[in-house]
Amino acid sequence: MQPENLFGPITQIGYLTDDIETTAAFWTQTSGIGPWTRMSGVSMATTMDGEPSTINIDVAITYKDDIQIELINPLCDSPSPYLANKRAGLWGLHHMQFTTKDINASMELAKSAGLELACTIKQGGGVYTYLRGHGVWFEMIQASEELEMFFGMIKSACDDWDGKELIRDIAL
């Protein structure tokens, strides 16, 4: 009997890096994916382990088929889901993201599965939560029309990519 899939399909795989340009080029050379949409200096108000925090990151996003690949470069030492990895120099796989229509119901399922809420972020019309898992973070994102349009724009750029302009910078 196959185990139950509590959260639906994985919608994103997140990686930490200290060099988005080099990491994006590597992914493109080895996987043929691109272009990358980069947002620099993104500041987010968060709650990490019950305490308010502000984190600053550079982030770049692309798609491989229907899976979003996210590169995150943490720019600060504020409490965040990224801090321990950054301090230890642990770059690479960081989290799996699941998109949900009901984040509260998904959070209850996560807790019943033994995952622990660590961080909540409200940014760009969305609510994101990070949960501690066994060696990898689980991220839940509340689906919204605004986010679907934004991610749809990035996916369309990937579907139509001609191999030029590896990184496209946008402001949030």
Model-predicted segments: where are they?
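Conserved catalytic-core motifs of GNAT/GCN5-like acyltransferases
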Residues: T37-G41, I121-K122
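Short acidic/glycine-enriched loop/turn segments that link adjacent beta-strands
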Residues: Q123-V127
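N-terminal beta-loop-helix "entrance" segment that forms/cooperates
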Residues: M44-E51
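Glyoxalase I/VOC metalloenzyme domain signal
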Residues: M1-T11, Y15-T37, E51-D58, Y63-E116, ...
